[in-house]
Amino acid sequence: MSLENQTQKERLCAVIRQLHTQGKSPATSTNYSFLDEDQVIFVSRSGVDKSQFQPEDFIAVDTMGLPLPPDEGIKPSAETLIHCFIYQNFPGITCVLHTHSVAATLLSGIFAAKQAVTFSGYEVIKGIAGQTTHETAIALPIFANDQDMKSFCQQLAQRQEELNNYGFLIAKHGLYAWGETMAIAKRHLEVWEFMLECELEQLKITPPLAAR
């Protein structure tokens, strides 16, 4: 293994453990990955306590989600196919993060019928690549949960034009965010999570019609 890949594993481990500390990866849930320069995806192994996540807990797979040496005998998470879809369809992306925060889980259910949560006026919107002002509205699409990952990826393909803001929600499940570097992916995740938390707090004051 290259020194660069080992370094990336250690960096992503630190991010994963931090997200667990923040309550965004309960009960061994969530998954994370990075793509190296040889188009090898290193994705987090299923069933590992994210508070204890270590570099050896990554599995190497190709862009179709098939395990590569020395991990051929290990079955990766079914959601690996979502990571593969993102890398295949958004050239230049090198990191994908998936969290299960309370805000993402609840709001994705509340607004599932609208197929998106829309944010406007937030200063942190400018943390999403390509956004230059808070004076705009930006949508985070919501997709129905589906245990069949091939079927789910077909949903993504059908609405791919909605995925240009580096994130989406799965109803009553969680958030996916990505970026051209690990730092950018983390920034995108933090922006979405912050705005979701703000909207959830706002619901406590003024519930929308969808929540009544």
Curated annotation (Swiss-Prot):
Q: Which catalytic reaction applies to this protein?
A: 5-(methylsulfanyl)-D-ribulose 1-phosphate = 5-methylsulfanyl-2,3-dioxopentyl phosphate + H2O
Q: Does the keyword Metal-binding apply?
A: yes
Query: Where does the record locate the signal sequence feature?
Result: none
Give a yes or no for keyword tRNA processing in this entry. Answer: no
Q: Describe cofactor binding as the record notes it.
A: Binds 1 zinc ion per subunit.
Q: Provide the GO biological process annotations.
A: L-methionine salvage from methylthioadenosine
Which residues are listed for Zn(2+) binding in this entry?
98, 100
This molecule's function is given as: Catalyzes the dehydration of methylthioribulose-1-phosphate (MTRu-1-P) into 2,3-diketo-5-methylthiopentyl-1-phosphate (DK-MTP-1-P).
Task: Give the UniProt family note.
Answer: Belongs to the aldolase class II family. MtnB subfamily.
Q: What is this protein called?
A: Methylthioribulose-1-phosphate dehydratase
Q: Which organism is it from?
A: Picosynechococcus sp. (strain ATCC 27264 / PCC 7002 / PR-6)
